[in-house]
Amino acid sequence: MPYDDSVPPTRRARPLLVATALAALCLTAVAGCGGAQDPAGTDSGAAKPGPEAEATASASASASTPSPEASPTGAQPSGATPTAPLPQGPLTGRTVVIDPGHNPRNREHTKEINQQVDIGTGRKECDTTGTSTNAGYAEARFTLDVSHRLRELLQAQGARVVLTHDDDRPFGPCIDERARIGNEAKADAVVSVHADGSAVGNRGFHVILPAAVKGGGADTSKIVKSSADLGARIAGHFVRTTGSAPSNYIGGGTGLDTRGDLGGLNLSTVPKVFVECGNMRDPEDAALLTDAGWRQKAAQGMADGIAAYLKG
């Protein structure tokens, strides 16, 4: 995870309808779906440089590095202009923005990503490095891999898919630009792909929903309900497709968590959620996250949830 360095705030009560719907899916999909809440669950900070992280660090960075303030006028969102006609399918005419969390080269640009940007209700770091498994598989590599799989699945159904980045930038994008890409694309849905960095024993996935936030440039009042629907659909299909249980340390067994401190959600004007696919610091979760077959299932679960949401 470490999409920011703050500890998640006190959890809010979930709407009964959302929790009930997910519980029904869980009962039919996987035993032991409702895990116990662990209030001690916290995010790790920056990724520890393991073997893969060290390899990433040795890669050459861009000769000219734009500052976070200049990032909105930087690179075009990846996939903004499809090079081939999309197939006709159930999602034809729909736009989905996929936001791969972090960037593999963020750790080479700590000065730039630590600069503060406006998130409407305050200021936060442009971006963070993300976490990694203990063996060094970086979250930023995981998020790109799953995002590519998800893009392919959605495009096969006719959706226009835009990535906020595709390992084609020296760092970032900053969290405010990530939100802006979704807004300017007039996305029907935005999904930010992540993996958590919590303590050993904390297992499972969770979906982060935007809280009702209004202040400065942030106003989520028009997307809270639709984002909750999107998140519940993704959570239910994620359980069904991957066989993974919802988080046992966040969300009270629902797989859903609401936060008002994330710029990527606060600044969104279109339905948006974050998906934390598992805990990279737990060996059992890490074994799943590093398995290509499981990552394909994770992408399929998200694609099915997005499609169910868009089809109503």
Report each predicted region and the residues it spans:
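N-terminal low-complexity, Pro/Thr-rich disordered segments
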Residues: L17-A21, A31-T95
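Active-site histidine-acidic residue metal-binding/catalytic motifs
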Residues: A84-R178
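Sec-dependent bacterial lipoprotein signal peptides
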Residues: M1-A31
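Glycine-rich, flexible loop segments associated with nucleotide phosphate handling
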Residues: L22, D127-T129, G136, S221-D229
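Secretory-pathway/luminal and periplasmic proteins that interact with or process carbohydrate-rich
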Residues: G34, R105-R107, S244
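Active-site-proximal helix/loop segments of hydrolytic enzymes
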Residues: F142-G312
